[in-house]
Amino acid sequence: MPRRRVVGQRKILPDPKFNSELLAKFINVIMQDGKKSTAEKIIYKALDVVAEKKGEEHLVILEAALDNVRPTVEVKSRRVGGSTYQVPCEVRPVRRNALAMRWLVEAARKRGEKSMALRLAGEMLDAAENKGTAVKKREDVHRMAEANKAFAHYRW
């Protein structure tokens, strides 16, 4: 426990185009080497491509994609008596969002399309339809938690 006061979480400014804090956070996740304007271009282009293909509102599709990627449980390593157990734990809401965004971006970076905007758009479309690499990652994490349910009593 820290002796000083607990520092609160910083408020993030909403993005300029859609006025969304979620999208601003997503831009920060995509950003590399501090190049925020490049990250914004990538995301806005990807959202335009997705909205054109789906015919829905930009943020609705992003929210649907993130909903299908958000994990509810994960495993954490816990050392008990010389052996390490994978203990299933519930994921806090802030971490759920962070993991979902990170997994979406990682999956998009591994895709084969030409530009990052197209890769991200493809991954968001796949995630919105409950398929794709990011959704598979979430299901793998859930499967690990389910397999280690016997160690749930070691939760802290």
From Swiss-Prot:
Q: Does the keyword Cell membrane apply?
A: no
What GO terms fall under cellular component here? small ribosomal subunit
Listed GO biological process terms? translation
GO terms assigned for molecular function: rRNA binding; structural constituent of ribosome; tRNA binding
Keywords, alphabetical: Ribonucleoprotein, Ribosomal protein, RNA-binding, rRNA-binding, tRNA-binding
Under InterPro entries, the record lists:
Ribosomal_uS7, Ribosomal_uS7_bac/org-type, Ribosomal_uS7_CS, Ribosomal_uS7_dom, Ribosomal_uS7_dom_sf
**HAMAP family, per this entry?**
Ribosomal_uS7_B
Q: Which family does it belong to?
A: Belongs to the universal ribosomal protein uS7 family.
**Role:** One of the primary rRNA binding proteins, it binds directly to 16S rRNA where it nucleates assembly of the head domain of the 30S subunit. Is located at the subunit interface close to the decoding center, probably blocks exit of the E-site tRNA.
How it assembles, according to the record, is: Part of the 30S ribosomal subunit. Contacts proteins S9 and S11.
Protein name as it appears in the record: Small ribosomal subunit protein uS7
Which organism encodes this protein? Shewanella loihica (strain ATCC BAA-1088 / PV-4)
Phylogenetic placement of the source organism: Bacteria, Pseudomonadati, Pseudomonadota, Gammaproteobacteria, Alteromonadales
